[in-house]
Each structure stands twice: as C-alpha cells, then as structure tokens.
C-alpha cells in the first residue's frame, strides 16, 4: 500500500498532474516500494502521434508510465525558438488521459532550476558534432535535464524516440558513463503516410514547404536502399535527391556507425540529415546496412534485431 500521506497523489486508472519535483519523486518512490515498475517518457509537450507511440510502447510493458512535459530552456541557444516553442499543456494532458497515462510531471523552470543551471552535464566530443556543430550548448542542456528527470523519477526504464538519434545516443552514453540505474529503450521514428517524420516543428511548414520537406525522408530511403554499394554509394544516392530539391537549405548529410562513430565498411550504420525549409530546421535519420553479397540481396547476418525482440521491452526485476 502507498503511504497514506500521498493519498490523491496517485490514483490508479486516473491521470494526476504534478508540478513539484519532490512530490513526483515521492510518488515514484512509493510505487517502487510496493513493487511497481516505473517508466519515464520525457517530452517537451506539443504532443503528436510520434510522442503517443512512445507512450504506447511504454504502457505495453505493464509499468506505471510517467510522462514529463517541460520546455527546457537550457537546450535552446541564442536566436532559437524558445519563446515560440508551442506550449499546449491542457491539450497534451487530454491526449495522455486518452492513452491511459496515470502520472504527468509538468514543472516550470524555477522548479527544475531553483538556483539556476549551476551544474550541467558535458556531452563530450560527440556533443560538438552533427547537431552540436550549429547548436553548441544544446546537448549539455538536454543531458542536464534528462539527468535531473532520471534522478527525480528513478524509473526502471526511460523511453526515447529514434528520430532524435544523436540525442538518444548521448543519453545512452551518459547512462553508461555515469552509472545511472535505468534501461534506455529506443522507439522507431513515426512517419506520416508519405514518409515525413513526425515533429512538433512540422506545424511551422506551409503546404509548399511540407512538400519540400519530404525530400529528407526520400533521400534517406534512397541512401538506405543503396547500402550494398557501400558508404560512397549511400551518400551519393541520398545527395542526388537533396540536390534535386529546390528550397532546401542542407546543413549536413552524414553516414556514421550506429553509435555515431566513423561509418564501418560493412554492417549497421546510420544516415543522418539536417536541413532548413524556410525558417524551420528539420532533422531525420535512418538505419542502413552496408555491404551485400554479389547477387545484390541484403546481408541478413548484419541486419539489426527487430524492435519487437528488444529485451529492453521486458520490465527488469529490481
């Protein structure tokens, strides 16, 4: 039984919103104390079907799911869209209620950083590459808030989408390097029927810009299908699509290993792209298998495991 002093702070089958980190932490601790497993889905709100798919995957593991909604000022640099970032808490809560979520954590900046951002997490060299090259403070801010959320909720598992693949990779790195007692679960990118990756920033695109944005997923798909041609073939196939698309301001197109080191000669790799369409910056990525037998069929020995067989989807014993 949960501590009577927390009565009303957690109501099975009903959604409760908490703003105070101490209260949310106490509720999560009490749930763990009675043998419940806890899952965390961190978000910045403005929820869409991509977020909800992550929530659904978390719920399928039969855990108490905590969804955090916090627009983290630390991960926005000078001239970025912190003030413009959509804040739709009431609508987000209703979406989560419909998904059967029981706990929402929605603090403000003063509650998360009562003394300001005095202590932060440095992302290491990878934090200065790809997204970090143009957003030098972004990943330190992101890792700092994720570290705080993990400390507050102490979840058994935390769920993140693969769309922000560099973010996912850095979170895994932080958890491993700093010995966080949590399992990170990756959820595949959710796409529209035409291939566009779901993003809170898609709402900034007009109809013509949205059509232009489709080149990102088309380029990634072309690159992935050229895996048998090696790294140069993958990049050439993807770049041909991007170069043929007017109105696209390419930031980077890179092929890396699955941990974002140098791309291997064969096996699992990741193709990543970032570009501006109008004033909206979009990112996307896709898994690529490099190398194929002479007959052109994919090398099945180097294929990644299907997401459904990921042992991380099984609640850990604690």
Swiss-Prot record:
GO terms for molecular function: ATP binding; pantoate-beta-alanine ligase activity. It is found in: Cytoplasm. (R)-pantoate binds at residues 75, 167. One of its GO terms (cellular component) is cytosol. Beta-alanine binds at residue 75. Its EC number is 6.3.2.1. The keyword Membrane does not apply. The active site is at 51 (proton donor). One of its GO terms (biological process) is pantothenate biosynthetic process. Gene3D superfamilies: HUPs, Pantoate-beta-alanine ligase, C-terminal domain. ATP binds at residues 44-51, 161-164, 190, 198-201. Keywords: ATP-binding, Cytoplasm, Ligase, Nucleotide-binding, Pantothenate biosynthesis. InterPro entries: Cyt_trans-like, Pantoate_ligase, Pantoate_ligase_C, Rossmann-like_a/b/a_fold. Pathway: Cofactor biosynthesis; (R)-pantothenate biosynthesis; (R)-pantothenate from (R)-pantoate and beta-alanine: step 1/1. SUPFAM superfamilies: Nucleotidylyl transferase. Its main location: cytoplasm. It catalyses: (R)-pantoate + beta-alanine + ATP = (R)-pantothenate + AMP + diphosphate + H(+). It is an enzyme of class 6 (ligase). Catalyzes the condensation of pantoate with beta-alanine in an ATP-dependent reaction via a pantoyl-adenylate intermediate. Homodimer. The reaction proceeds by a bi uni uni bi ping pong mechanism. Belongs to the pantothenate synthetase family. PANTHER family: CYTIDYLATE KINASE/PANTOATE-BETA-ALANINE LIGASE, PANTOATE--BETA-ALANINE LIGASE. This is Pantothenate synthetase. It comes from Nocardia farcinica (strain IFM 10152). The lineage of its organism: Bacteria, Bacillati, Actinomycetota, Actinomycetes, Mycobacteriales.
